[in-house]
């Protein structure tokens, strides 16, 4: 016989209570950065969603004797995000270039401006294969974007309706988002360097190990510092 489980919602969340925030409530203003570790800068870009921002990263780097920066994740493609990046380029890089762009996964807030950034700095894109190809297909006007235009958000509405979503209003909203992905990811760089599980990348003299996750995205890359137990 099954027994009901009673939840004590007034009990403290021990996991949350043990989290330590070294910077307290400090946040980097738009167009600025905060250094969270030597050579690691945190920045935020706005998003037009309920979750109204994304955390991005700049890591001081050196490749083949050239000093500069590695970007980790990009923000969505829109004029506001481009302008915020230009402000950062002008004021936060100490006059140094962007050497490469690493994208952790294919969601628009992470990959949206990858093409623009790579073209802006003639920098290579590093990304997992599954997420690069998925983003390439979804942003391609002859691929996922074209299917979305024909089927209504890539068939998402039909899929959700088959699984119980019966609100005509909600289904209409979903069908109206047929070009939702390609609006925020208008294109991808034509080539990339593949990230794989277990890769070790040297960024600014520090070693970062690539760990792949599956679920949040097809092949989500996390970078874990071999020296400081940091994760990005």
Model-derived segments and spans:
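Short Pro/Gly-enriched beta-strand edge/turn motifs at strand-loop
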Residues: 14-15, 36-44, 175-184, 204-206
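A short catalytic or substrate-binding loop motif that flags glycine-/basic-rich loops and adjacent residues
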Residues: 36, 49-51, 195, 214-217
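Metallo-beta-lactamase
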Residues: 66-80, 173, 181-193, 200-202, ...
